[in-house]
Design a protein with these regions (language model features):
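Extracellular beta-propeller repeat domains
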Residues: 1-287
């Protein structure tokens, strides 16, 4: 996952190791003077192997783990920044509630929204909401792996009362989708199905929204040997535009698995492999 900043302190997680063997929550000042391990996951009821980001609200961190919990299908947890232990708000069962969340939570008011990458009634992941006190989880949608998509690995974004996200698989060609759904879960709309051509395929990260335009990356597809794309999608407009196809051979690298960020009139992001050094690249793309 990524780091989050509060004042002069960064918070983050590791997916492995630690005293409990299943990852950690840590803090470090922005000057890097010393790292503090705030919590070590055990892989038991507290969860284990977090792959997403933390969310800070007030004095409380919220997050998810991919594994652990009472059924081994991951948990939603809270952790006070001045505390010593996490509180498990929910343990996924791998049933209709889904299992194995890969992304991060978002917060609106006192409600958390997120996705699981697997299971659910449709067998291909879920969208859910849960109050910050963990009183009850509501499954807003279950992906089927068909035209609606399946197996989301990124996170949701919220605009007004509408959630937007992507799935890695499913859609009309099995190459993933872009979707929207109201926060009440009344109906999911597939905005776009990736074809695996110049538009890309299998998005692994999350979308960002600027004005009425969504930006994101697909981990494969494109015009350059299937090495992924950077794209835009205009809401209620012209649809999807492939902005760039990664070469997998030049300094741009290939297989972007995260999400871009917008700075001024430029998108910045990373690729996971290739590039002259062989380990991926950091890029900037002017809009």
């Amino acid at each position: 996952g990524s780091l989050i900043l509060s004042g002069s302190t960064l918070y983050g997680m590791t997916s492995e190791d630690g005293a409990g063997g299943s990852g950690t929550i840590f803090s470090i000042p922005t000057n890097g003077s010393s790292l503090t391990t705030l919590y070590s996951f055990t892989g038991g009821n507290d969860g284990g192997s977090p792959f997403g980001d933390l969310l800070l609200s007030g004095n409380t961190l919220y997050g998810m783990t991919y594994g652990g919990g009472t059924s081994g299908d991951g948990v939603i947890f809270s952790f006070p920044v001045d505390g010593t232990a996490t509180t498990t708000l929910y343990s996924f069962t791998g049933g209709n509630d889904g299992g194995n969340p890969y992304g991060s939570l978002i917060l609106s008011g006192s409600t958390l929204y997120g996705m699981t990458s697997e299971d659910g009634a449709g067998g291909s992941g879920t969208i859910f909401s849960i109050p910050t006190n963990g009183s009850s989880l509501t499954t807003l949608y279950s992906f089927t792996g068909g035209n609606d998509g399946g197996n989301p690995y990124g996170s949701l974004i919220l605009s007004g009362s509408t959630l937007y996200g992507m799935t890695y698989g499913g859609g009309t060609r099995g190459d993933g989708t872009i979707f929207s759904i109201p926060t009440n879960g009344s109906s999911l709309t597939t905005l776009y199905s990736f074809t695996g051509g110049s538009d890309g395929a299998n998005p692994y990260g999350s979308l960002i929204l600027s004005g009425n335009t969504l930006y994101g990356m697909a981990s494969s597809g494109g015009t350059s040997s299937n090495n992924g794309t950077l794209f835009s999608y205009v809401l209620q407009g012209s649809g999807l535009t492939s902005l760039y196809s990664f070469s997998g051979a030049g300094p741009d690298g290939g297989y972007p698995e995260g999400s871009p960020i917008l700075s001024g009139n430029a998108l910045l992001g990373m690729t996971s492999s290739y590039s002259p050094a062989g380990g991926g690249a950091i890029f900037e793309f002017g809009l």
